[in-house]
Amino acid sequence: MANSVCEVLLTEARLKAPRDDVDVVAGAVVDFWGIVRGSEEGREIDGIEYEAHREMAEHQLRGIAQQAIEKFALQLIVIHHRIGFVAAGQSSLFMRVMSQHRAEAFRASQWAVDELKKKVPIWKRAKFKIDNQPAREGKRDRPAETHLISRG
């Protein structure tokens, strides 16, 4: 869409929802928050350390956002992802999707989160409460210094 907006951000700062400016053609806004659970592999954790291959992660996030705009006719997609340590109960991912109709907004949000988990090189390592041992190496999951990647 010619007037669509795509915003992607990797940050070590706590996530906040952007302002609520809504396009007059939008009929639906879906906000998704990915929250760090208090357990991993059945054990209590203090939180998760996220790391990323920054340049590749930025590239993949931009690509996913652009694909979502085209595939679901979105007016807006915002993807903010944390890196660094994220405590249990804090958000590691914020995504806002805006479209003319709710069905597209929900589908786009689900699709974009699934694509992010499959394609974006962001890795997690749980910090366990009892023994502070890292999770199994190589486990790949999601939900990233504040750095606005793109907006346009």
Stretches found by the model and what they are:
Residues 1-91, 98-152:
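N-terminal, polar/charged subdomain of small-to-medium soluble alpha/beta proteins
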